[in-house]
Amino acid sequence: MSMIEEIYAREIFDSRGNPTVEVELYTESGAYGFARVPSGASTGVHEALELRDGEDRFGGKGVRKACSKVNEEIGPNLVGMDVTFQSAIDRALLELDGTDNKENLGANAMLGVSLAAARASAEFLGLPLYQVLGGVSSSTLPIPQMNILNGGEHADNNVDIQEFMIMPIRANNFQHAMRMGVEIFHALKNVLKDEGLSTSVGDEGGFAPDLKSNKEALEYIITAIEKVGYKPGEQVMLAIDAAASELYQGDKYHLEGEGKSLTADEMIDLYQDLVENYPIISIEDGLSEDDWEGWKKMTEKFQGKIQLVGDDLFVTNTDRLTRGIKEDIANSILIKLNQIGTVTETLEAIELAKKNGYTSVISHRSGETDDPFIADLAVATNAGQIKTGAPSRMDRVAKYNQLIRISEELYGVSRYPGMGSFYNLEV
């Protein structure tokens, strides 16, 4: 056994220069764990509450309150618990908070402790983090969804769709997938430069130029893929995140960059047009988080053909996912640790999805740190897909580098699933 001896939290900064929580956990055995908590820009209204100070400093975004919750409430209550009992630690956190949305302790405080405990457990047991989280069957390296062109809330430009991603589905292994993605990323930079467009990057490391339309973004990406000798639709597929909740106001979806206001039916028609003309295999948050009727129609339209990922729709919450399953809405869930606040609840959401034929996409947040925890989580759960930005900015690359290290550890036993990740599609 390895008993928790001390837990300490401090205020640090994320990739956007906003305060966030760092937690360090010490045990009597000497095993140590840490965590650096991410935060989102386009956040779902149903996410667990992130505790912020609301004072003048840092525009109200300070996290001293969250750190105090760790240092003065959580820590003293968890001292003496066995760090290898993750579910017991997370249950204690939930009981201590006592609310449905973590508004007492804050999901950022709770998650920091939960992640740090998992790491300390791995160190004590002398096992890789991914094996502690998932067991000896953890061996699948994920397809990266690389967000190489940014819009929406992730960029200061006129592009409405928030993320345009590439997926190297025909790579031989994870390292090969990284090579393909990196080569396409650099080719896209040259394509944009040749057109006299900006090559500055957005929150997630992708380029963020002003463009005439969302289709133009896809055209530039197709050009970049072909420039380095890969075949769109065969070796590389595309994915988009519309983050439609950010576009939704007054029963319409407002695409300001294109000067359009669309109904849910018209948004579905827009996606149909994109899917027919570009090799798009995955659409995330195509409609607003509470537009269940619209989501039902979209699922009926694309079921079995396109991966329909619920991010703001499901917020890594088993209650909302259960409703989606019962109503046959979407076919995939985006997994963000800080949407729910504990490792155990996150694993439960992934397991529920898997049992009901939904895929899981492990995801970062736009406000990231250099903590690569989600890389281990992706392998632990054999999710088959990870979304952690472009291959630029160390807050993104840290996750890719960790996956490279894991792939070396699992040499000879790991698998890169390719199209097998879309096991619920007719492809």
Curated annotation (Swiss-Prot):
Chain positions recorded as (2R)-2-phosphoglycerate binding sites: 162, 336, 365-366, 387
Subcellular location: Cytoplasm; Secreted; Cell surface
Database matches in Gene3D superfamilies: Enolase-like C-terminal domain, Enolase-like, N-terminal domain
Known EC number: 4.2.1.11
Pathway(s) of this molecule: Carbohydrate degradation; glycolysis; pyruvate from D-glyceraldehyde 3-phosphate: step 4/5
GO molecular function, one term: phosphopyruvate hydratase activity
GO biological process, one term: glycolytic process
Residues binding Mg(2+), per UniProt: 241, 284, 311
Swiss-Prot/TrEMBL catalytic activity: (2R)-2-phosphoglycerate = phosphoenolpyruvate + H2O
UniProtKB keywords: Cytoplasm, Glycolysis, Lyase, Magnesium, Metal-binding, Secreted
InterPro entries from the UniProt entry: Enolase, Enolase-like_C_sf, Enolase-like_N, Enolase_C, Enolase_CS, Enolase_N
Cofactors required: Mg(2+)
Pfam family membership, one: Enolase_C
Tagged with keyword Transport: no
Top-level taxon of origin: Bacteria
Entry's cofactor comment: Binds a second Mg(2+) ion via substrate during catalysis.
Cellular compartments per GO CC: cell surface; extracellular region; phosphopyruvate hydratase complex
Active site: 204, 336
Family: Belongs to the enolase family.
PANTHER family: ENOLASE (PTHR11902:SF1)
Biological role: Catalyzes the reversible conversion of 2-phosphoglycerate (2-PG) into phosphoenolpyruvate (PEP). It is essential for the degradation of carbohydrates via glycolysis.
Name by which UniProt lists this protein: Enolase
Species assigned in the record: Natranaerobius thermophilus (strain ATCC BAA-1301 / DSM 18059 / JW/NM-WN-LF)
